[in-house]
């Protein structure tokens, strides 16, 4: 795979993380650049690791994992999305009571859920002549950049939307989950 194809793949793989991080940024009380960078790093590292895992799986057991990856991603995103919607529907909270940061595990779970498609890509890359390490690094870097930008964009969208931002963020996560299911069903049909 040439450099331009790798860059296009990397940024395409980062779009789920970008959308999810906009929702995450919108639900925080004035997230700082440090929080945005932390989110970007978590998403980027996980998004870089998953194609490597997928590549290894592709070498050994692709038919088994491909049957379930979309259901795992959908379930995680659906649960997280429902949780965000539920929190957004609770009694309105003053701006000063909004969270200052998301927990590490919430970010990791969201990052894993949005990166399972990168694992599936890694499975496919196992059958091509690619430098998987450089490709995974490009995917991780693009995701880090896009997730950081998403958090910063969410910072400015959040005050405009108030608590609705959390509901919208939850809907976005559920939508990403349904999109993963749709793409899988469409590809297997």
From Swiss-Prot:
Gene Ontology BP terms: intracellular manganese ion homeostasis; manganese ion export across plasma membrane
Residue intervals passing through the bilayer: 3-23, 41-61, 65-85, 104-124, 132-152, 167-187
Keyword terms of this UniProt record: Cell inner membrane, Cell membrane, Ion transport, Manganese, Membrane, Transmembrane, Transmembrane helix, Transport
Major subcellular location class: membrane
Similarity-based family: Belongs to the MntP (TC 9.B.29) family.
Protein name: Putative manganese efflux pump MntP
Function noted in UniProt: Probably functions as a manganese efflux pump.
InterPro entries reported in the protein's UniProt record: Mntp/YtaF, Put_MntP
Compartments it resides in: Cell inner membrane
GO MF annotations, alphabetized: manganese ion transmembrane transporter activity
PANTHER family: MANGANESE EFFLUX PUMP MNTP-RELATED
Superkingdom: Bacteria
Cellular component annotations (GO), alphabetically ordered: plasma membrane
Signal peptide (residue range): none
Membrane topology: Multi-pass membrane protein
């Amino acid at each position: 795979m040439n450099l331009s194809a790798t860059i296009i793949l990397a940024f395409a793989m980062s779009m789920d993380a970008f959308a999810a991080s906009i929702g995450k940024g919108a639900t925080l009380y004035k997230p700082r650049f440090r929080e945005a960078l932390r989110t970007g790093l978590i998403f980027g590292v996980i998004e870089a690791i998953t194609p490597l895992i997928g590549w290894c799986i592709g070498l050994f057991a692709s038919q088994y994992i491909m049957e379930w990856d979309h259901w795992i991603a959908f379930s995680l995103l659906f649960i997280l999305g429902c949780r965000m919607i539920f929190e957004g529907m609770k009694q309105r909270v003053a701006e000063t009571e909004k969270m200052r940061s998301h927990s590490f595990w919430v970010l990791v779970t969201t990052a894993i859920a949005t990166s399972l498609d990168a694992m599936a890509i890694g499975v496919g890359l196992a059958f091509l002549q690619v430098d998987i390490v450089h490709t995974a690094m490009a995917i991780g870097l693009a995701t880090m950049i896009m997730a950081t930008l998403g958090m910063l964009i969410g910072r400015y969208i959040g005050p405009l939307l108030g608590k609705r931002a959390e509901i919208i963020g939850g809907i976005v996560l559920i939508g990403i989950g349904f999109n993963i299911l749709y793409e899988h069903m469409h590809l297997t049909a």
